[in-house]
Each structure stands twice: as C-alpha cells, then as structure tokens.
C-alpha cells in the first residue's frame, strides 16, 4: 500500500559534556587542567534516494534521532562527534514544519541539513586564569533540537490515470504494470494512490500512478478531494480513463466533468499533455461509432489503427507519436484516443507502446 503522508519526530544529538581533569605526570606536583571539550551532537539530514518511491518505510518508526556527542577526554582530547542521522526519502518528498512547507526534496542524491547537533561543552582547560589555576568546572553540552514534521509525497509518475470511481483505473494499472491494487465493483476501492512500473521491453518502461476516483466537487475537497488531486500535479502525461459502458453518463460528459475539476484545481494541471482511454469497450454498445463521435467532439479525425494490433482498431494517434513530427507536447489536442478493455486485456499490450511514445 502506498503511504503518501506521515508524521515523524526528528531530533539532533546532544553535545557531550566537557571534561574536568588535570595533568598527572611524574615530578609534576600540581599539573594544570587538561580536560577536553565534549563532542558535538549528531546532525539530522534528509537524503533523496531514487531507489525508493514511497513513504511506507516510516510506518511504525516515528522517532528519528541522531547520536549524542561523547564526553571530552583527558589530555585535552575532544570527544567524538555524535553519529549523524540520515533520513532516506523518495524524490518529490515535501517536509512541513509548523504547518508550513520547510523543505522540498526533488533531486536524487541530494542531502539537506535539517537539524544541527548540540555544541559540545568546553573542558576545564578553557577556564584556567591567573586567579584560578585549577578550575574544577566544565561546561555541559548543549541540548539537541527536536522537531515534529510531516512528510508528504507528491507522486512523480510519468503517466497519471484520471477518472471517475469504478472507471477501471485500478484494473488497468494491475493489468499492464507490477502494481496490485485492491479491486472491487464499488466506488472508492482505491483509497490511496498506487504506483506501478510498466515494462515495455528489456530497456524501456515508465511509472504509472492510479489515484482515487475523482467526483464532481473534488477540487473543493469533496469525496477524497484535493488530497489526491495533488498527486498528479507532477506527472508528465495525463490519461483520462472513461467508462464506455455507462448508460447514465456518456463518455463526452465524463470527459467534460473531469476536465472541469482539473481546471478548477489547477490550470497548469489541466494544460498537461493528455490522452483518452475508452475502457470497457468489450461491453459497450457500438464502440466504433462511440469512438468516431468522441474524436469529432475533440475536433480530431478518427483513424484506422490495424497496424498497431488494435482490436477494435478505430481510434486516434497524434502524428508525433508515429514519428512524423518532433515531439512538441505543448499543443492542446489529445495525443491518443484508444478503446480498450482492462479486464479482457484488449489493446493493453499496444497501450504500453503508445504511452511510452507519448512521454516527452
């Protein structure tokens, strides 16, 4: 299960205490002070690791603390610095403190200092003076810093699936990727985003995100609302998954309502490159006519796509996806319109190649 938000407590280490000691050497009756300083407490860092893509590892591990600094030693030896705490997070993790965004961690291998460890205390060697030749005082180390933070992950996926509840998004991602989401015939089966790795061939693939179904008013927080719309903000291409079998709400109306919610939430999100998947085509009435009408609705010309092993074969592919033009994905037109069936795997194999070509 994908965990997208978690609260943890981070703490830097306490500085080690300074040492009270005096030189003890043969023939030296009253050796001077030689107490060393305490070691600094360990720091807390966040490090971005491209090999992890969830916050699931934080479940059950709430406290993350660096080690304390070691006490100062004799003969002016400084105590060892406390071991740093390195907190590994996936790319795209945002760290919130006191209700405000504190850190935005995007770049792989990036390491950011979050909390500095407490300073080690001074040993008694620092307190010798003309009037006090044998000081018996040393400083305590300074306390570390503790902070409660919230980690929030915006999915950084290549393809983001957008659709109403029960449109078949979870079935689709389980069919073409390694994701295994919960699937059932009722709305809001998906309660958290799912990530799936889609392997096209031995060398190519991409990451797909399935978010909980959008309902009207989602941009205002209804249903599962804004908390999940944010997950598709960083995806490269949107794939609208429409239920071609619905009689109460046609695919044109589904598309218009979904796009309206995206535009209300974020104009930038609504302007992302996109394509349309007409799911459940195997149980839809006259899918060819439906596909033609939808292409006309979007001012596109329906195509015969037998060469792509599509069955049914009517749909639309932008010329750029077929290598006729350079990939400039700033245009508003759809990149693809494809009928498919996630349940019976109709056209799902060809879909992998289409989605790969759609990526910038």
Swiss-Prot record:
One of its GO terms (molecular function) is magnesium ion binding. Residues 1-156 form the Obg domain. It is an enzyme of class 3 (hydrolase). Belongs to the TRAFAC class OBG-HflX-like GTPase superfamily. OBG GTPase family. Keywords: Cytoplasm, GTP-binding, Hydrolase, Magnesium, Metal-binding, Nucleotide-binding. Mg(2+) binds at residues 170, 190. The keyword Transferase does not apply. Its cofactor is Mg(2+). GO terms for biological process: ribosome biogenesis. Its EC number is 3.6.5.-. Gene3D superfamilies: GTP1/OBG domain, P-loop containing nucleotide triphosphate hydrolases. InterPro entries: G_OBG, GTP-bd, GTP-bd_Obg/CgtA, GTP1-OBG_CS, GTP1_OBG_dom, GTP1_OBG_dom_sf, OBG_GTPase, P-loop_NTPase. It is found in: Cytoplasm. It comes from Helicobacter acinonychis (strain Sheeba). GTP binds at residues 163-170, 188-192, 210-213, 279-282, 341-343. One of its GO terms (cellular component) is cytoplasm. An essential GTPase which binds GTP, GDP and possibly (p)ppGpp with moderate affinity, with high nucleotide exchange rates and a fairly low GTP hydrolysis rate. Plays a role in control of the cell cycle, stress response, ribosome biogenesis and in those bacteria that undergo differentiation, in morphogenesis control. This is GTPase Obg. The keyword Cytoplasm applies.
């Amino acid at each position: 299960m994908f965990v997208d938000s978690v609260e943890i407590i981070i703490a830097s280490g306490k500085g080690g205490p300074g040492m009270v000691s005096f030189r003890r050497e043969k023939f030296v009756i009253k050796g001077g002070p030689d107490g060393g300083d305490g070691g600094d407490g360990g720091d807390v860092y966040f490090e971005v690791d491209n090999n992890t893509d969830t916050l699931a590892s934080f479940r059950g591990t709430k406290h993350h603390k660096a080690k304390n600094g070691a006490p100062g030693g004799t003969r002016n030896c400084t105590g060892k610095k406390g071991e740093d705490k390195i907190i590994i997070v996936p790319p795209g993790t945002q760290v919130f403190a006191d209700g405000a965004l504190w850190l935005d961690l995007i770049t792989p291998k990036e390491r950011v200092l979050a909390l500095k460890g407490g300073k080690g205390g001074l040993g008694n060697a620092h307190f010798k003076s003309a009037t006090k030749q044998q000081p018996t005082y040393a400083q305590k180390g300074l306390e570390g810093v503790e902070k409660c933070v919230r980690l929030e992950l915006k999915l950084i996926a290549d393809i983001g699936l957008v659709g109403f509840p029960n449109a078949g998004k979870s079935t689709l991602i389980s069919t073409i990727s390694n994701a295994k989401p919960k699937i059932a015939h009722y709305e809001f089966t998906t309660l958290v985003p799912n990530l799936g790795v889609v392997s096209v061939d031995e060398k190519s693939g991409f990451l797909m995100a399935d978010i909980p179904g959008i309902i009207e008013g989602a941009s205002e927080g209804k249903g599962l609302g804004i908390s999940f719309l944010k997950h598709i903000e960083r995806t490269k291409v949107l794939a609208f998954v429409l239920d071609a079998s619905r009689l109460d709400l046609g695919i044109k109306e589904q598309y218009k309502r979904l796009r309206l919610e995206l535009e209300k939430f974020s104009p930038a999100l609504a302007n992302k490159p996109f394509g349309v998947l007409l799911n459940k085509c195997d149980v839809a009435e006259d899918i060819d006519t439906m596909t033609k009408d939808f292409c006309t609705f979007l001012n596109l010309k329906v195509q015969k796509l037998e060469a792509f092993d599509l069955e049914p074969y009517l749909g639309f592919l932008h010329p750029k996806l077929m290598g006729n033009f350079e990939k400039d994905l700033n245009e508003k037109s759809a990149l693809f319109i494809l009928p498919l069936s996630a349940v019976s795997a109709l056209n799902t194999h060809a879909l992998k190649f289409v989605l790969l070509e759609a990526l910038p």
